[in-house]
Protein backbone atom coordinates (compact mmCIF):
# COMPACT_ATOMS: atom_id res chain seq x y z
CA UNK A 1 0.00 0.00 0.00
CA UNK A 2 1.40 3.41 -0.90
CA UNK A 3 2.25 5.94 1.79
CA UNK A 4 -0.46 8.31 0.54
CA UNK A 5 -3.16 5.62 0.71
CA UNK A 6 -2.01 4.60 4.19
CA UNK A 7 -1.95 8.24 5.32
CA UNK A 8 -5.49 9.02 4.14
CA UNK A 9 -6.87 5.67 5.31
CA UNK A 10 -5.36 6.39 8.72
CA UNK A 11 -6.94 9.84 8.85
CA UNK A 12 -10.26 8.35 7.76
CA UNK A 13 -10.16 5.76 10.53
CA UNK A 14 -9.06 8.35 13.07
CA UNK A 15 -11.76 10.77 11.94
CA UNK A 16 -14.58 8.22 12.08
CA UNK A 17 -13.72 7.00 15.57
CA UNK A 18 -12.95 10.50 16.87
CA UNK A 19 -16.31 11.75 15.62
CA UNK A 20 -18.01 8.75 17.22
CA UNK A 21 -16.33 9.37 20.58
CA UNK A 22 -17.03 13.11 20.50
CA UNK A 23 -20.68 12.76 19.46
CA UNK A 24 -21.74 9.56 21.22
CA UNK A 25 -19.67 9.75 24.40
CA UNK A 26 -18.23 13.20 25.11
CA UNK A 27 -21.22 15.35 24.08
CA UNK A 28 -23.80 13.50 26.24
CA UNK A 29 -21.46 13.75 29.23
CA UNK A 30 -20.88 17.48 28.76
CA UNK A 31 -24.62 18.05 28.30
CA UNK A 32 -25.36 15.93 31.39
CA UNK A 33 -27.76 13.91 29.27
CA UNK A 34 -29.63 11.16 31.09
CA UNK A 35 -27.96 8.54 28.88
CA UNK A 36 -24.61 9.55 30.41
CA UNK A 37 -25.67 10.45 33.97
CA UNK A 38 -28.07 7.60 34.80
CA UNK A 39 -25.62 4.68 34.35
CA UNK A 40 -22.98 6.31 36.58
CA UNK A 41 -24.50 4.97 39.81
CA UNK A 42 -24.75 1.47 38.33
CA UNK A 43 -21.06 1.70 37.43
CA UNK A 44 -20.16 2.76 40.96
CA UNK A 45 -19.27 6.34 39.98
CA UNK A 46 -20.63 9.58 41.42
CA UNK A 47 -22.95 11.04 38.75
CA UNK A 48 -21.46 14.47 39.49
CA UNK A 49 -18.23 13.29 37.81
CA UNK A 50 -19.85 12.86 34.40
CA UNK A 51 -18.83 16.33 33.12
CA UNK A 52 -15.24 15.95 34.36
CA UNK A 53 -14.98 12.55 32.67
CA UNK A 54 -16.39 14.09 29.48
CA UNK A 55 -13.82 16.89 29.58
CA UNK A 56 -10.95 14.45 30.11
CA UNK A 57 -12.19 12.19 27.32
CA UNK A 58 -12.69 15.16 24.98
CA UNK A 59 -9.19 16.49 25.64
CA UNK A 60 -7.73 13.03 24.95
CA UNK A 61 -9.61 12.76 21.64
CA UNK A 62 -8.61 16.29 20.59
CA UNK A 63 -4.97 15.54 21.39
CA UNK A 64 -5.25 12.48 19.12
CA UNK A 65 -6.25 14.75 16.23
CA UNK A 66 -3.23 17.06 16.50
CA UNK A 67 -0.26 15.33 14.84
CA UNK A 68 2.46 16.51 17.30
CA UNK A 69 0.36 15.38 20.31
CA UNK A 70 -1.32 12.32 18.76
CA UNK A 71 0.82 9.72 20.56
CA UNK A 72 0.36 11.39 23.95
CA UNK A 73 -3.37 11.71 23.26
CA UNK A 74 -3.64 8.04 22.37
CA UNK A 75 -1.66 6.95 25.43
CA UNK A 76 -4.05 8.98 27.61
CA UNK A 77 -7.10 7.69 25.70
CA UNK A 78 -5.83 4.12 26.11
CA UNK A 79 -5.70 4.66 29.88
CA UNK A 80 -9.23 6.08 29.86
CA UNK A 81 -10.49 3.15 27.79
CA UNK A 82 -8.77 0.76 30.20
CA UNK A 83 -10.74 2.30 33.05
CA UNK A 84 -13.95 1.92 31.05
CA UNK A 85 -13.11 -1.72 30.35
CA UNK A 86 -12.41 -2.39 34.04
CA UNK A 87 -15.65 -0.66 35.05
CA UNK A 88 -17.73 -2.67 32.58
CA UNK A 89 -16.04 -5.92 33.60
CA UNK A 90 -16.49 -5.24 37.31
CA UNK A 91 -20.27 -5.01 36.97
CA UNK A 92 -20.35 -8.10 34.77
CA UNK A 93 -21.56 -6.50 31.54
CA UNK A 94 -21.64 -8.65 28.37
CA UNK A 95 -18.06 -9.35 27.27
CA UNK A 96 -18.07 -8.80 23.50
CA UNK A 97 -20.56 -5.92 23.26
CA UNK A 98 -19.67 -3.91 26.38
CA UNK A 99 -16.44 -4.96 28.10
CA UNK A 100 -14.35 -5.28 24.94
CA UNK A 101 -15.82 -2.18 23.26
CA UNK A 102 -12.93 -0.09 24.62
CA UNK A 103 -10.49 -2.55 23.06
CA UNK A 104 -12.20 -2.17 19.68
CA UNK A 105 -12.05 1.63 19.87
CA UNK A 106 -8.43 1.60 21.05
CA UNK A 107 -7.30 -0.75 18.28
CA UNK A 108 -9.06 1.39 15.67
CA UNK A 109 -7.54 4.62 17.01
CA UNK A 110 -4.02 3.16 17.26
CA UNK A 111 -4.47 1.57 13.83
CA UNK A 112 -5.40 4.94 12.37
CA UNK A 113 -2.31 6.58 13.84
CA UNK A 114 -0.10 3.68 12.74
CA UNK A 115 -1.35 4.04 9.17
CA UNK A 116 -0.75 7.80 9.01
CA UNK A 117 2.55 7.94 10.93
CA UNK A 118 5.75 6.59 9.36
CA UNK A 119 7.53 7.27 12.67
CA UNK A 120 5.13 5.00 14.56
CA UNK A 121 5.43 2.34 11.85
CA UNK A 122 9.22 2.41 12.30
CA UNK A 123 8.84 1.85 16.06
CA UNK A 124 6.09 -0.77 15.73
CA UNK A 125 6.68 -2.54 12.41
CA UNK A 126 3.98 -5.00 11.39
CA UNK A 127 5.05 -7.53 8.79
CA UNK A 128 2.07 -9.14 7.13
CA UNK A 129 2.53 -12.14 4.90
Regions flagged by a language model, labelled:
Residues 7-11, 31-34, 56-58:
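Short hydrophobic/aromatic-rich motifs at helix boundaries and adjacent loops
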Residues 34, 47-49, 53, 95, ...:
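Solvent-exposed, flexible loop/coil residues
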Residues 37, 52-55, 59, 72, ...:
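A general structural signal for well-ordered alpha-helical segments in protein cores
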Residues 45-65, 78-79:
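Core segments of alpha-helical transmembrane spans in multipass integral membrane proteins
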Amino acid sequence: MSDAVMFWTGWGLTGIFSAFLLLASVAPKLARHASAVDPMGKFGWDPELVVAIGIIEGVCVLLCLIPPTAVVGLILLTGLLGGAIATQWRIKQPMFSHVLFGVYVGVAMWGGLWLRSPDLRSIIPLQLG
